[in-house]
Amino acid sequence: IDNRITLSDQLPSSVVTPIFAGTPYANIQSAAFYTNIADTRTDGFELAGHYQLELGGWGRLDFNGGYARNNTRITGLDDVGSIPGNQIIGRNTQGLIEDGTPKDKLTLSANWLYDGWSVTVAQRRYGEWQSRNAANPALDQTFGAQWVTDLDVSYRFDLGLTLSAGAINLFDSHPDKLEGAQLYGVPKYSITSPEGAQGAFYYTSVSYDF
C-alpha cells in the first residue's frame, strides 16, 4: 500500500498547548492526526476448508476451518519534515503497523443440525503479537497466543419461533496483561488486543419468523 493512512504518534503538551492557546480547545494536552506518509507491504496466505458429515437418523455435522498468516512491514516513510523533539510516525506507531496484530489466526467450528436443533461450537486462536515502547526497546512486550471458544445452542419450533442460548468466549479467556501497567491498582490490558479484555459474555435470545 502506497501512502497508507495511519494515525501519527501522540504529540505531547509541549507541542499541542501553544497551538491551541487562546482557542476553545486550550485544555487539550495531547493530539494525534491522520497521515499518509508510510508505504507498506503485506505478504501472506489464507486457507479455508469445509466438510459435511451425514449422521443418518441423527442429523448432520458441518465442519469449517480456516488459517491465515500475514506479515506487514514498512517499506518507506516520506520525508515531510519533523516536529522538534518528536516523530510523526515514531517507534510505537511503526510497531502498531508491523507487529500490532497477530501474525496468524486459526478458526475451527462444528455445527450439528438435527430436526429443529442447531448446536455450534467455534474455536479461535490468535497468534503472538507485540507492543513497542515509544522510546525504549527494553520495554517492548510480546503477548502470547490466545484461544477463544464460542457456543450456541438453539431450537426452532415448527411455527417459526427459535429459542437460543450460548456464550461468546465461553471459558472467559483473557489476553496477557501489560507488564507493570496499572490503573487504580488494577492491572491493565492492551487496547490493541485482538479479542479485547471483556471476558465471557453469556446470552439467551428469542426470535420469530413471520
PLM region descriptions:
Residues 92-96, 139, 186, 191:
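Peri-catalytic substrate-binding/gating loops that frame the active-site cleft of hydrolases
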